[in-house]
Amino acid sequence: MLCVIYRSSKRDQTYLYVEKKDDFSRVPEELMQGFGKPQLAMILPLDGRKKLVNADIEKVKKALTEQGYYLQLPPPPEDLLKQHLSLTGHIRTESEQ
């Protein structure tokens, strides 16, 4: 199974996976409007792969088969201040506030 991955022209770190190059026929129009003009990122064989870097390969395969596309959204932003305070013991629990 091959998948074609496109980068969003409107949303940073947002990718659309489809089964065939330039075939967005199964992707909802509303999604395409919010996604912007798709920019080809790569063509990737999924057969024989056990994992992908930023997506669950089994979810990708299932979505491609069932709905014809998979939308990869950016990871949630890291709260570096909260991480720092937690590591240094300066973060308060709800009972301390």
From Swiss-Prot:
Positions of the YcgL domain: 1-85
TM region positions: none
Pfam families from the UniProt entry: YcgL
InterPro entries according to UniProt: YcgL-like_sf, YcgL_dom
SUPFAM superfamilies xref list: YcgL-like (SSF160191)
PANTHER family: PROTEIN YCGL
Name of the molecule in the record: Protein YcgL
Organism encoding this protein: Escherichia fergusonii (strain ATCC 35469 / DSM 13698 / CCUG 18766 / IAM 14443 / JCM 21226 / LMG 7866 / NBRC 102419 / NCTC 12128 / CDC 0568-73)
